[in-house]
């Protein structure tokens, strides 16, 4: 029976770990210019990582950003009342899960119902948020609009 391989017995393949070349340590191996060539900026000193050869750098070409990013901003997925009327033509109760199942929005994200279009079906809609016009149109059609947030 073969011996079990143990972690402390593992060794890298021969030649896979080459020693680092120390440059500039005598004429025998990469001495004198140390792989930098003879003259020029690269031979004399390092240039900054963002240096673009005299061209106007990207951080100066782009405009400064104004304002700030609100950490409490919530991005809602929107669905219009016309889409709800088309997807749920039989009426009844409609939840966010039903809207996701109908393919109108993606799952695991808050949903806002907007009032674009017409609705003539009685729907009891439960969603995260509603616009005023959406609530008016849903209630005018005989349904209810319940916001969960």
UniProtKB/Swiss-Prot annotation:
Keyword match RNA-binding: yes
Write out the ranges of the annotated region (Disordered): 8-49
Keywords from UniProt, A to Z, are: Ribonucleoprotein, Ribosomal protein, RNA-binding, rRNA-binding
Cellular component terms per the entry's GO annotation? cytosolic large ribosomal subunit
Read off the Pfam families from this record.
Answer: Ribosomal_L27A (PF00828)
Q: Name one GO biological process term.
A: translation
Instruction: Please indicate if the UniProt record lists Cell cycle as a keyword.
Output: no
InterPro entries (alphabetical):
Ribosomal_uL15, Ribosomal_uL15/eL18, Ribosomal_uL15/eL18_sf, Ribosomal_uL15_bac-type, Ribosomal_uL15_CS
According to the record, the signal peptide region is none
Q: Give start-end positions of Low complexity composition bias.
A: 31-45
Q: Which GO terms describe its molecular function?
A: rRNA binding; structural constituent of ribosome
Q: Which domain of life is it from?
A: Bacteria
> HAMAP family under this entry?
Ribosomal_uL15
Q: What interactions and quaternary structure are annotated?
A: Part of the 50S ribosomal subunit.
Q: Per its database record, what is this protein's job?
A: Binds to the 23S rRNA.
> Family, per the entry?
Belongs to the universal ribosomal protein uL15 family.
- Protein name according to UniProt: Large ribosomal subunit protein uL15
- Species name for this entry? Corynebacterium aurimucosum (strain ATCC 700975 / DSM 44827 / CIP 107346 / CN-1)
Question: Taxonomic lineage per UniProt?
Answer: Bacteria, Bacillati, Actinomycetota, Actinomycetes, Mycobacteriales
């Amino acid at each position: 029976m073969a011996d079990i391989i143990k972690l402390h017995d593992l060794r890298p393949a021969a030649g896979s770990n080459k020693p680092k070349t120390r440059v500039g340590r005598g004429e025998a191996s990469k001495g004198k210019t140390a792989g930098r060539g003879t003259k020029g900026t690269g031979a004399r000193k390092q240039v900054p990582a963002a240096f673009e050869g005299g061209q106007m750098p990207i951080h100066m070409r782009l405009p400064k950003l104004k304002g700030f990013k609100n950490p409490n901003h919530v991005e809602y997925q929107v669905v219009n009342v016309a889409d709800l009327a088309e997807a749920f033509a039989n009426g009844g109760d409609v939840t966010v899960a039903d809207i996701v199942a109908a393919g109108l929005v993606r799952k695991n994200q808050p949903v806002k119902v907007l009032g674009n279009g017409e609705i003539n079906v009685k729907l009891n809609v439960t969603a995260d948020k509603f616009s005023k016009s959406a609530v008016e149109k849903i209630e005018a059609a005989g349904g209810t609009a319940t916001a969960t947030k």
